[in-house]
Structures are given as C-alpha cells and as structure tokens.
C-alpha cells in the first residue's frame, strides 16, 4: 500500500521516517495511547480502517489487536497543524494498552485538578 502523495507531502517525519500517532476513543474523547507510524502504516490505516502502527523496537508495522484481539476501528484521521502528528479517532475493543488497561494513561497521575 502506498500513501497518497498529497498526504505524504504534508507529513513531517523524524530522522527514522516516523511521526507520532495519538489515538483517541470516539464518544468519550479519552486519549488511549500514543504510538508511531510510517507512511505505509498510515496508508494501511486509511485504506482498511484498522489502526496500524510502526514498532520502533521490532522495526516493523503492527495492526492493533492482530494478536490480542483488542482492536481499534478507525473512524477519522486528522493531521495536526505542524504535520508531525496524526490523531486517530477509534472504537476500542478491549484494552488499548499493552498492560491490558483501557488506556495507557491510567498508570500515574503527576498533577491533578486544583482542589
């Protein structure tokens, strides 16, 4: 799969050819996770509506839920104003985090609301 050249031209990638992907739950607005994508992962996501990311540690693409069953059905993809981050709005099935938690941001609260 190849990325539309018009979209590819707008992306700003790091030295490894990657850009950040923030994944948000449709309906609740909760941020579920942050991962990396390359052009091919974004192209696959846009074509299949299955969230596909790039693993820096394994050096390969992975489809969310392919092994765990914790899938992400993509409803929309937005590019930020700088072109270096995409926002995926998804329906999450199961946990988004590799720990099994619904979101990767349940672990530690560093600063809470003013009381």
Curated annotation (Swiss-Prot):
Q: Where does Mg(2+) bind?
A: 80, 82, 84
Question: Which is a GO BP term held by this UniProt record?
Answer: L-histidine biosynthetic process
Listed A to Z, the keywords are:
Amino-acid biosynthesis, Cytoplasm, Histidine biosynthesis, Hydrolase, Magnesium, Metal-binding, Zinc
Q: Which regions form coiled coils?
A: none
Q: Which cofactors are named for this entry?
A: Mg(2+); Zn(2+)
* GO MF assignments: magnesium ion binding; phosphoribosyl-AMP cyclohydrolase activity; zinc ion binding
InterPro entries to which the protein is assigned, alphabetical: PRA-CH, PRib_AMP_CycHydrolase_dom, PRib_AMP_CycHydrolase_sf
The principal location of this protein is cytoplasm
Q: Name one GO cellular component term.
A: cytoplasm
EC number(s) reported in the record: 3.5.4.19
Give a yes or no for keyword Magnesium in this entry: yes
The EC class name is hydrolase
What the record notes about the co-factor is: Binds 1 Mg(2+) ion per subunit.
Residues the record lists as binding Zn(2+): 81, 97, 104
Q: Where in the cell is it found?
A: Cytoplasm
Which pathway is this protein engaged in?
Amino-acid biosynthesis; L-histidine biosynthesis; L-histidine from 5-phospho-alpha-D-ribose 1-diphosphate: step 3/9
Which chemical reaction does it catalyze? 1-(5-phospho-beta-D-ribosyl)-5'-AMP + H2O = 1-(5-phospho-beta-D-ribosyl)-5-[(5-phospho-beta-D-ribosylamino)methylideneamino]imidazole-4-carboxamide
- Whom does it interact with, and what assembly results? Homodimer.
Q: Which PANTHER family match?
A: HISTIDINE BIOSYNTHESIS BIFUNCTIONAL PROTEIN, PHOSPHORIBOSYL-AMP CYCLOHYDROLASE
Q: What does this chain do? A: Catalyzes the hydrolysis of the adenine ring of phosphoribosyl-AMP.
Q: Which HAMAP family match?
A: HisI (MF_01021)
Please state which protein family the record places this protein in.
Answer: Belongs to the PRA-CH family.
State what protein this is by name. Phosphoribosyl-AMP cyclohydrolase
Q: Which organism is it from?
A: Mycolicibacterium smegmatis (strain ATCC 700084 / mc(2)155) (Mycobacterium smegmatis)
Q: What is the lineage of its organism?
A: Bacteria, Bacillati, Actinomycetota, Actinomycetes, Mycobacteriales
